[in-house]
Amino acid sequence: MNDFHKIANEIARIPDENRSWEERLNELVKFRAYLKEYYDSYGEDYLSFLERIEKENDLEEKYILEYDFKKEVLSKDYNLDGLNYLLVNILFKYKLAIEDYNEYVNLLKEKYDVELKADWEKILSEKDLDLLEALSLLTFLQRSDYWDYEHMPLSYAIFDGTVDNILESIEDHIDEENIEFLNIFVK
């Protein structure tokens, strides 16, 4: 498997260039190949734990299992940590982090009628977000203050496929109309 920390450091050393939105978005979408490599490396311990979490009907027990999994497995996963670092480097290197992300995330909450934290899965499972929505959601996950085992939003969003869903949405919306929309709304 690639050393994602090393790749992240190499990206950080790339000289700054004026790139088009399309070029920058395509650099971000390339991250999906690293995700696939990571997903293909899941061992039986990951898969069986995920299966147990998914089958659990008791909501409280489900949260406990998820917390334990994050604490005992994911927090010690060097490759997941590297993917997290790599994604953050890509977002900043290619200037894809949205400054006004909270404004757009709040619009997403209204669009999907999301109030409770547990309902966020409605948005996070969407694969049809426009570019601004998808980039705002990625920035929101990246900048979240919850770095304890209970939350670890970006790492867990990478692990559980949420980031891949968002990147798939970005890949599907790289077109002239959406890029023009970004040019208007993103400074």
Model-derived regions: residue spans:
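Short terminal alpha-helical segments
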Residues: D3-A33, L83-L91, L96
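Boundary/linker elements of alpha-helical solenoid repeat scaffolds
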Residues: K117-E121, Y149-H151
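Amphipathic alpha-helical elements of HEAT/ARM-like alpha-solenoid repeat scaffolds that form extended
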Residues: E27, L65-D68, N84-L91, E121, ...
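Long amphipathic alpha-helical segments
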Residues: E176-E180
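Short, charge/polar-rich alpha-helical segments
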Residues: W120-L129
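Extended hydrophobic, helix-prone interaction segments
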Residues: W21-R24, V29, L35, Y39, ...
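Acidic, low-complexity, intrinsically disordered interaction modules
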Residues: S41-K71, S75-G82, I98, L129-V163, ...
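Intrinsically disordered, low-complexity linker/tail regions enriched in Pro/Ser/Thr
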Residues: A97, Y101-Y104, L108
